[in-house]
């Protein structure tokens, strides 16, 4: 492993240890009737669980088999639950301080046990709800008006499905469900702006095989996300191309008068590389004597001033998952602002950010719904 990935792993593991320690210390302080033996067992369990997701992730990058898939799923589910236990622990500590120092209760210590029981029970219910909610994919219809839209595109329908994260958790059956839902919408074209794969080891051809059943008459177009570029993107790009999907790796195509472009995530993550990639496409458009590109597949809703300056009318993005679960729904909003999800304007550029169909990490959605987007060109 190179130095930067190792450092990132160590930082993530340190955060997980800190979070588990806070949950553990709060639980033993507030949960009634714990024996010394139970506390010791809990301490060992929390150490193992704190290590579980990083270990499972490393295994999933090297091996692909049912045992690793089960380990990864269990670790990811626990990651979701401990997230809610951590939030619950913060609430318990704050509520206890309020009860203790408000002097409104004669015996505040009597509330310690019931307080923990109620809050941790809510955390468990939130996790269960998240598991169920993540499997219910909504169809979101979005009317789109593009000033330079060719007349031939008016009234056409495009399906946008991002962030499927095909891998140990979202397998081939999940892909079939997404394809079936998309097919029912009878799209003229399909856009996939990244993270079709989770980036883990697996039978890539098998995972994307259901996509062969999608047959929009104007094609399917894909640009890479960060999960296709964790290692070498070539294996993922090749698997996607083999099912008949056009991969736009800093490339553009003209489809019935509409120019569609895609930028690789690595290049979009740098302003200089992003500008160079779009300038190259703009130069090719000028040399051919045709109009500027109209639609850009850009995995993350970033570099908007550069995209607008390059003359695009519509950017299609994913990446954010809308935050996926609380409190990351709030954190993501702080990072991406209004472009966290939905359709918004940046100057002359329209930007649609999808919350995605799949999940990463915890297979849960709380405070945010998974979606397939139907774009209706007006």
Predicted regions and their residues:
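Non-catalytic terminal accessory segments
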Residues: 1-135
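Alpha-helical transmembrane signal-anchor/signal-peptide segments
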Residues: 137-147
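Soluble catalytic domains of enzymes that build or remodel membrane lipids, polysaccharides, and related
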Residues: 145-378
